[in-house]
Amino acid sequence: MTDVPVSRIRNFSIIAHIDHGKSTLADRLLQDTGTVQQRQMKEQFLDNMDLERERGITIKLQAARMNYTAKDGEKYVLNLIDTPGHVDFSYEVSRSLAACEGALLVVDSSQGVEAQTLANVYLALDNNLEIIPILNKIDLPGSEPERVANEIEEVVGLDCSNIIKASAKAGIGIDEILESIVHLVPPPQDTVDQPLRALIFDSYYDAYRGVIVYFRVMDGQVKKGDRVRLMASGKEYEIDELGILSPNQIPIDSLHAGEVGYFAAAIKTVEDARVGDTITLAEKPAKEPLPGYTEANPMVFCGLFPTDADQYEDLREALEKLKLNDAALSYEPETSTAMGFGFRCGFLGLLHMEIVQERLEREYNLDLITTAPSVVYRVTTVDGEVTEIDNPSLLPPPQKREKIEEPYIQVEMITPETYVGTLMELCQSRRGVFKDMRYFTLSRTAVVYELPLAEVVTDFFDQLKSRSRGYASMEYHLIGYRENPLVKLDILVNGDSVDALAMIVHRDKAYYVGRALTEKLKELIPRHQFKVPIQAAIGSKVIASEHIPALRKDVLAKCYGGDISRKKKLLQKQAKGKKRMKSIGTVDVPQEAFMAVLKLDPQ
């Protein structure tokens, strides 16, 4: 099991869009090489989380080592490094691709090339990987292998003359795939004699052993008991356990250049072993780390509040536990006058946010309210000081700020031609700037727009899917900050500002958003004994307002006929009471009102 010459090692990953059959293909490879016994096999073997199985997406990376005897009689070791296919996790993808020499590009032969596939192929090309194209699901009645092969040639620029036609489900073409990995993917470089450098491509927290780090040895070799240093954090650890993933962990004594494995060294949190960091020996460190390490910064923020104030501690514990496994998640305590105690959390993107929320509710039985997601704004004050703000209620007043800049992203959508018009309309309505349009084949078009991230975080993805009947796919990346005339929109209920409803919007849209929001709140807030004004304001200027009429008790019911002055006296007494009630009464804002912000139609 242990000593394998470097020339017989093949490291590869699988690139595919959601639902194009990546996990099924991985299962089939594990089965055909005898890595996983038939009786232990279950669907999507490498997707460990229930949520991953349910949504059919891969969130955390996995890795597996397979022993394969090729047709030429030689024994090879194949290391499959799984990648998450979703755009929020593109940094993780780039690191796991950096740990490989080749990639299988799996495309559904009934669907064609999708945006995320394309984004990941570009990452693979940046890392100089050998790409092997595979058409999957060719046993389906709707499969069109010729059309899709042409599409791959045109869009990606790969030679598809000897493309592999396969069906992971039916087990067609699996031997061909294994042979092509052996013959086409180059072996790792033989650099066993150099100082140790290894790339971390994933890590997760284990309650008994601390953080388990998955890594690929690039140069040199590492043994159990070695003292290693992580170059980005500068911390040193002693390796207690070293092993290979097959896919279950099998401890061994040493690993050398080209091999993939795991180690445990009593590391406390995942933050200490960041993805992309370089491992080297403490005694003989390498001169410089491997290139490409960056810290994953959260892009989207929202407030999470427990519906029941007693669950605050539970929420904090749950976030702490999730944080152990998710270095990209950030959170800090926050108090809101409307919602009480909670946390302001930062995420990589929308999918990441949804998954964290769903895991909190599902794995920790919490009932949560979320505020509208916001992005990180860059504010320059009059004194020339630049601060980053992720919460609209922290924005300095207009007279103290000089400019607000917001993050912009470049969105690439791949869609059937019929839906191009409606998707362009969607982007225009979100302040998008048209950049480029490319026709791939007769039926597929790529449309490129630059958009403010704030316009995409609420429901852009849902709109994209509903307008294109689910056929369009998108991929985005950050392109920098730009200055825009942005204002803070406050919502006042009965004269008091409700901090959880505050938002930062573009000046041209402020009136429409304010109008829509006040109308929505008028429906949702119950009537009180006194008249309740709802206002949308920018600074001290009210731009839209609605009133909830008072419930009126009939105080004259007991006066039959009788004297007008008697009736006047009762009415004046009622008016006085209402006035007093209005000055000291509080208005309950129901939870649906906070959700209303998320459901506003930005049109």
Curated annotation (Swiss-Prot):
Which Pfam family, just one, is annotated for this protein? GTP_EFTU_D2
Q: Name one GO molecular function term.
A: GTPase activity
SMART domains xrefs: EFG_C (SM00838)
Q: How does it sit in the membrane?
A: Peripheral membrane protein
| UniProt binding sites for GTP | 19-24, 136-139
**GO cellular-component term (any):** plasma membrane
What does the record give as the reaction this protein catalyses? GTP + H2O = GDP + phosphate + H(+)
UniProt-listed GO biological process terms: positive regulation of translation; translation
Please state the Enzyme Commission number of this protein.
3.6.5.n1
Q: Where in the cell is it found?
A: Cell inner membrane
- Family matches, as PROSITE patterns: G_TR_1, G_TR_2
Provide the alphabetized UniProt keywords. Answer: Cell inner membrane, Cell membrane, GTP-binding, Hydrolase, Membrane, Nucleotide-binding, Protein biosynthesis
Entries under CDD domains matching the protein? EF4_II, EF4_III, LepA, lepA_C
Q: What is the enzyme's class at the highest EC level? A: hydrolase
Q: Key word Iron present in the record? A: no
Which family would the database say this protein is a member of? Belongs to the TRAFAC class translation factor GTPase superfamily. Classic translation factor GTPase family. LepA subfamily.
Q: Which NCBIfam families match?
A: lepA (TIGR01393), small_GTP (TIGR00231)
Q: Which HAMAP family match?
A: GUFP, LepA
Q: Kindly provide the name given to this protein in its UniProt entry.
A: Elongation factor 4
Native source organism of the sequence: Rippkaea orientalis (strain PCC 8801 / RF-1) (Cyanothece sp. (strain PCC 8801))
